[in-house]
Amino acid sequence: AHRIYILGLRSSGVLAGFLSFYFNHIFEDVVNVGAAQGETFEQMLRIGPNDVLIAISFPRYSQRTLKAVHYAKKQGACIIGITDSTSAPLAAMANHVLLARSEMASFVDSLVAPMSLLNAIIVAVGLRKKHETSNTYAMLERIWSEYDVYEKNEEIHSAP
C-alpha cells in the first residue's frame, strides 16, 4: 500500500491509536484518522486505489466511521474492517474482515479481545518486516537514549 489509514472513532479510537503508534514504527506512511486529529474527511481527502483503510468499529457502531469507510471505498481504497460480527455494518463494506468479540457487561466497552487481535497483527507484521522493524528500533533506541526519553534507573526494574 502507498499509505495506510487507520480509522477508529469513539471508544474504537483508543484501538486505532494503539495500532497507529506501532504501525508508524513499521511503515513509512501511516495516518491515524481520529476525532482528536480533526475532521475525518479532511484527513482522508487524498485516499485512493493504492491505499489501505483499516477501519475499527464496535458496538454501538459510529455513523461517522461508516460514512468515512463509504467514502474510502468510493475512492477505490482497500478496506480492512476490524469489528465484532459478520453482521456488523462494517463487515458488509470491507474487502477483508477480522473479527474480535466485544462485550458490554456494563456501561464500559470491553476492548480486551480487540486489543489482543491488534497486538497479534502488530507482532505478525513486525516479524514479516523484520529488517525494517529492526532498523527502526535501532534508530529509536539511539534517539531515546540521547534525549533521555525513558527512565534509566535500573533499581526501578529490580524492585520486589
Regions found by a protein language model. Give the residues of each.
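Glycine-rich phosphate-binding loops that contact phosphosugars or nucleotide phosphates
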Residues: H2-S116, I122-L127
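A short, charged, Gly/Pro-tolerant segment at domain boundaries
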Residues: H131-P160
